[in-house]
């Protein structure tokens, strides 16, 4: 069933990846997304340029690659695939000069996963063809 915060804010379907990131942002950052619905793939807006505000989510959107280095707490967005038409979202739990670690819910693999991080011509690439971008709280 659907998981709601005490004030009625829609966190999403229990145990899904979207519910995890929305619950994390609500409990840890006290952040409510203006648009509370959608699948993971809906969190990335293809019409936005790197670093623009994603109004539906109330967060800055960065592409992969991006001029801005990923940060702990950023939401990573994975594009849909043949086996997963909904896409996937996760949270960056660790960043260093050459890798990021994510934490995630509702995956067959591990709840934590690492990806290489490369800087080429002042652009930060998270090495995965599945990662289309990320969302970040405005500073």
Predicted regions and their residues:
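General structural signal for secondary-structure boundaries
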Residues: 39, 66, 114-116
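N-terminal capping segments
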Residues: 1-48
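Aromatic- and glycine-rich peptidoglycan recognition patches
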Residues: 82-139
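Extracytoplasmic/secreted proteins, especially bacterial periplasmic and envelope-associated proteins
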Residues: 16-23, 71, 91, 130
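...with weaker cross-activation on analogous glycine-rich loops/strands in unrelated enzymes
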Residues: 41-107
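Generic intrinsically disordered, low-complexity segments enriched for polar/acidic and small residues
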Residues: 17, 21-25, 40-41, 59, ...
């Amino acid at each position: 069933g659907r998981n709601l915060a005490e004030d009625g804010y829609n966190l999403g379907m229990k145990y899904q990846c979207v519910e995890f990131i929305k619950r994390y942002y609500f409990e840890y950052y006290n952040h409510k997304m203006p648009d509370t619905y959608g699948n993971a793939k809906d969190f990335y807006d293809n019409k936005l340029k790197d670093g623009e505000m994603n109004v539906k989510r109330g967060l800055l959107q960065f592409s992969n690659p991006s001029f801005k280095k990923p940060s702990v707490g950023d939401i990573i967005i994975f594009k849909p695939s043949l086996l997963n038409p909904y896409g996937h979202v996760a949270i960056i739990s660790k960043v260093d000069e050459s890798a990021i670690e994510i934490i995630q819910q509702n995956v067959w693999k591990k709840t934590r996963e690492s990806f290489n991080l490369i800087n080429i011509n002042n652009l930060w690439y998270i090495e995965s063809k599945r990662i289309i971008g990320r969302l970040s709280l405005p500073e």
